[in-house]
Amino acid sequence: MNLKKFPRHALTFGPTPIHPLKRLSAHLGGEVELYAKREDCNSGLAFGGNKTRKLEYLIPEALEGGYDTLVSIGGIQSNQTRQVAAVAAHLGLKCVLVQENWVNYSDAVYDRVGNIEMSRIMGADVRLDSAGFDIGIRKSWEEAMADVRKAGGKPFPIPAGCSEHPRGGLGFVGFAEEVRQQEAELGFKFDYIVTCSVTGSTQAGMVVGFAADGRADRVIGIDASAKPEQTFAQIVRIAKGTAELVELGRDITDKDVVLDRRFGGPEYGLPNEGTLESIRLCARLEGMLTDPVYEGKSMHGMIEKVRLGEFPAGSKVLYAHLGGVPALNAYSFLFRNG
């Protein structure tokens, strides 16, 4: 496997820390050891997150190609768009963000706080669009790029989750290599890695990265899209392409991709009671915050899998905390009583 042949523009602090979730593990019976790898604090650029790791492999193309405007898309409370806005500000580039109405949630301040507030503060041209949630290339995003061209600019396209970009999975191939180095220092290997999945490139990169040591199917994706068939197909497709790019040496198949479909409801961006319970439990036992859209759902999935005995006793499970906490402010009504 060869990741080093791809240029990388450093946007993160370096390897993200791994630490034990001792109190949560004990609360769940103590037979499974839970750990977290903190992608949520991986950068000084507006709180960072998993997209910042991905952008390290996209930005070299933007800089080398003389692009002057980063154009990205997400929901109103998109973490991706906030991270793109931060990178643009850091590099002295312009930024246009399309924020679609992906979540069926009404709150008086939903489009004024959290991620979107930070993007505006960082100077991004934020454009609200009424289109609902879906996975793939969006018309509104293509129109935004056309607008930049008409104004004489040179737009660099960054799709939702970085996932439709050919190099969108590379960052999390690097994540797997980083984990292997940390495992050598820790003196043990993780039996399972739990991650949230929606647009697919995070899990796809992990699948390829851990396939290098035979652990592709030990990456457990927790669907948060509530459109798991689309998400699964996207993960497989991106993983196949990423495997070819990094010269993995074997094909990725459907059997390499594990996506748990039980925890994404009721729909994208809306938490269920299990999501909210898991957010509170993790926060109160570990002081580690998760959000209602992504990490609350993957945390719920991990907790339930422990409770149901789906991880064998003695397993060491690594929870990939991908970020997302800035969106909590947009859901303040749900937590008005804690």
From Swiss-Prot:
The active site is at residue 78. Its cofactor is pyridoxal 5'-phosphate. SUPFAM superfamilies: Tryptophan synthase beta subunit-like PLP-dependent enzymes. It catalyses: 1-aminocyclopropane-1-carboxylate + H2O = 2-oxobutanoate + NH4(+). It comes from the Bacteria. Keywords: Hydrolase, Pyridoxal phosphate. This is 1-aminocyclopropane-1-carboxylate deaminase. The keyword Lipoprotein does not apply. The keyword Transport does not apply. Its EC number is 3.5.99.7. Homotrimer. InterPro entries: ACCD_DCysDesulf, ACP_carboxylate_deaminase, ACP_carboxylate_deaminase_bac, TrpB-like_PALP, TrpB-like_PALP_sf. It holds the Pfam family PALP. One of its GO terms (molecular function) is pyridoxal phosphate binding. One of its GO terms (biological process) is amine catabolic process. Catalyzes a cyclopropane ring-opening reaction, the irreversible conversion of 1-aminocyclopropane-1-carboxylate (ACC) to ammonia and alpha-ketobutyrate. Allows growth on ACC as a nitrogen source. HAMAP family: ACC_deaminase. Belongs to the ACC deaminase/D-cysteine desulfhydrase family. The modification N6-(pyridoxal phosphate)lysine is found at residue 51. It comes from Variovorax paradoxus (strain S110).
